[in-house]
UniProtKB/Swiss-Prot annotation:
Signal peptide: none annotated. It holds the Pfam family ATP-synt_VA_C. It catalyses: ATP + H2O + 4 H(+)(in) = ADP + phosphate + 5 H(+)(out). Its EC number is 7.1.2.2. GO terms for cellular component: plasma membrane; proton-transporting ATP synthase complex. This is ATP synthase subunit beta. It comes from Fervidobacterium nodosum (strain ATCC 35602 / DSM 5306 / Rt17-B1). The lineage of its organism: Bacteria, Thermotogati, Thermotogota, Thermotogae, Thermotogales. Belongs to the ATPase alpha/beta chains family.
Length: 472
C-alpha cells in the first residue's frame, strides 16, 4: 500500500487521465485516485494503470471525465478500488466502485475489500469434483455443472436465457441456501433494468447482488465491473463458506472493454486488434473462480460470438477456461420445448463415468444416441413419411420424441406466465426417468404425457388423466 499524496492532472484524453506527483510520492499500479468533478458534483475514481516516467502516472477513469481540466488536484487513496461486501449488500444493485444505483439508500452492514486479489492457492483449493445440482433435468443429465466450475451460455435473444438464469438463482437460493451475484458487463441498460424488475417479481432478489457496468459507461468501468462482482462472491465463499453462483453477462464485453483500455493506454494491438494481454486479463478473472475447502464460486458466463466465428480470440480464450457449455437452440424454443437447451450441442467435461458414475454416463449417452438417430431420420421422414421406416426406427422416433418432451420442465420463475407450478428434479430422479424411457417401459404412453412434467411418476399420472379425458 502506497501512502496518501496529492497530484495534479496534466493531460486528459477521453477516459485516460495523466496525473503528475511530487518526487517520491508516486502511487502504485492499481491504486485508486480521487478527483472532485465540478460538473457532476461527485467524486470521480481513477485507477492507475501505468507509470510513464517524470513522476507521472497514466490512469483510466471509472466514469465520464467531462468537466475535468488540467491542473486539478487529485488525491491518491493509497489503496485499490474497494467493493462493499457482506450481508448488507444482498438485494441491492451497485456500480463498479460499489455505489448503490437502485435508489434504496446507503449500504449498511458492509465492509470493503480490494477488487484486485490473488487467486486461492493450490493448498486452499478443493480438488475433488462435485456436481452442482441445478434441478433442471436437461442440464443435470447431459451437461452437469461442476461446483466451482465455469459454464458458458451460448444463445441469442428470446430463447429463454434470462428465465434459465433466474431459475438457477432461485434454485441455488431455495434448494442450496446459496447466494447469486449478477455482473452486467457492457450490456444494454434496459436489459439490466428488466432483469432487476423480473427478479423482484419472482422473489429471488433478496438472495442476489446485481453489479452493473453497462454499455453507456467508459471502458474502465466495463473492464473492472466483473472483478467487483467476483470480490462480493469471494466474501460469501471465504467468510461464510457458501456455494455462490456468479453470472457474467457478457464475458465478450469484458474482453472488448479490455481491448479499448489497452488501445487508450497506447499498447501495441495483438491478433484481430485485441489487447496483447488478453490471455492474462482473462486468466486473472477466471482463476479466482474456483472451489475452496470452505465454499465454492460456480460461474455461468453468457458468451457473445462475434460474427459466429468461434475462432475469434475473445471466445477462443474463454473456451480454454470453461468446464461446460450450454447451447440454447432457437429451433427448440420455436417448438415450445423449454428450457431450450440443445441436448446434442451442450457438453460438460465432467460427464465422465469416473466422476458422475457409470449409470448416469450410460443413460446420458443413451439419450444422446436416440436423439442423434432421430435427427438423422428426420430428412427421410420429411420426404417419405413415417410409414417407410423400419419397425426399429419407428420405435426410436417415438422414444426420441418422448425424450425431447421429457427434457422440458415448468420453471418456478415462469409460473405466473404458464400457470404451471415449477418443479425441482433431483439428479437421481432424472436418471431414473430417462433410464426407464430408454428401456421401453413407457412405449405405450402418449407423447403429450411427457411434456412439461418433473419426474417420470408425474408423466405416468398425466398419461392416466389424458386417457380418462379421452374416455369421457
Amino acid at each position: 500500500m502506497s501512502k496518501k499524496s496529492i497530484g495534479k492532472i496534466v493531460r486528459i484524453i477521453g477516459p485516460v487521465v495523466d496525473v503528475k506527483f511530487s518526487e517520491g510520492e508516486l502511487p502504485d499500479i492499481y491504486d485508486a485516485l480521487v478527483v472532485n468533478n465540478p460538473q457532476t458534483g461527485k467524486k470521480l475514481i481513477l485507477e492507475v494503470e501505468q507509470l510513464i516516467g517524470d513522476n507521472t502516472v497514466r490512469t483510466v477513469a471509472m466514469d465520464s471525465t467531462d468537466g475535468l481540466i488540467r491542473g486539478m488536484e487529485v488525491e491518491n487513496t493509497g489503496e485499490p478500488i474497494k467493493a462493499p461486501v457482506g450481508r448488507g449488500i444482498l438485494g441491492r444493485m451497485i456500480n463498479v466502485i460499489g455505489e448503490p444505483i437502485d435508489e434504496n439508500g446507503e449500504l449498511k452492514d458492509v465492509e470493503y475489500w480490494p477488487i484486485h486479489r490473488p487467486a486461492p492457492s493450490m493448498a486452499e483449493q478443493k480438488t475433488e469434483i462435485e456436481i452442482l445440482e441445478t434441478g433442471l433435468k436437461v442440464i443435470d443429465l447431459l451437461a452437469p455443472f461442476p461446483k466451482g466450475g465455469k459454464i458458458g451460455f451460448f444463445g441469442g435473444a428470446g430463447v429463454g436465457k434470462t428465465v434459465l438464469v433466474m431459475e438457477m438463482i432461485r434454485n441455488i437460493a431455495i434448494e442450496h441456501k446459496g447466494f447469486s451475484m449478477f455482473a452486467g458487463v457492457g450490456e444494454r441498460t434496459r436489459e439490466g433494468n428488466d432483469l432487476y424488475l423480473e427478479m423482484q417479481e419472482a422473489g429471488v432478489l433478496n438472495n442476489t447482488v446485481l453489479v452493473f457496468g453497462q454499455m453507456n459507461e467508459p471502458p474502465g468501468a466495463r473492464f473492472r465491473v466483473a472483478l467487483t462482482a467476483l470480490t462480493v462472491a469471494e466474501y460469501f465463499r471465504d467468510v461464510e463458506g457458501r456455494d455462490v453462483l456468479l453470472f457474467i453477462d457478457n464475458i465478450f464485453r469484458f474482453v472488448q472493454a479490455g481491448s479499448e483500455v489497452s488501445a487508450l493506454l497506447g499498447r501495441m494491438p495483438s491478433a484481430v486488434g485485441y489487447q496483447p494481454t488478453l490471455a492474462t486479463d482473462m486468466g486473472e478473472l477466471q482463476e479466482r473462480i474456483t472451489s475452496t475447502k470452505r465454499g465454492s464460486i460456480t460461474s455461468v458466463q453468457a458468451i457473445y460470438v462475434p460474427a459466429d466465428d468461434i475462432t475469434d480470440p475473445a471466445p477462443a480464450t474463454t473456451f480454454t477456461h470453461l468446464d461446460a457449455t450450454i447451447v440454447l437452440s432457437r429451433q427448440l424454443a420455436a417448438l415450445g420445448l423449454y428450457p431450450a437447451v440443445d441436448p446434442l450441442d451442450s457438453t460438460s467435461k465432467i460427464l465422465d463415468p469416473n466422476i458422475v458414475g457409470k449409470e448416469h454416463y450410460e443413460v446420458a449417452r443413451g439419450v444422446q444416441e436416440v436423439l442423434q438417430r432421430y435427427k438423422d431420420l428426420q430428412d427421410i421422414i420429411a420426404i417419405l413419411g413415417m410409414e417407410e421406416l423400419s419397425e426399429e426406427d419407428k420405435l426410436i422416433v417415438q422414444r426420441a420424441r418422448k425424450i425431447q418432451r421429457f427434457l422440458t420442465q415448468p420453471t418456478h420463475v415462469a409460473e405466473r406466465f404458464t400457470g404451471m407450478p415449477g418443479v425441482y428434479v433431483p439428479i437421481k430422479e432424472t436418471i431414473r426417468g430417462f433410464k426407464e424411457i430408454l428401456e421401453g417401459r413407457y412405449d405405450d404412453l402418449p407423447e403429450a404425457a411427457f411434456y412439461m412434467v418433473g419426474t417420470i411418476d408425474e408423466a405416468v399420472e398425466k398419461a392416466k388423466k389424458l386417457t380418462q379425458a379421452v374416455v369421457i
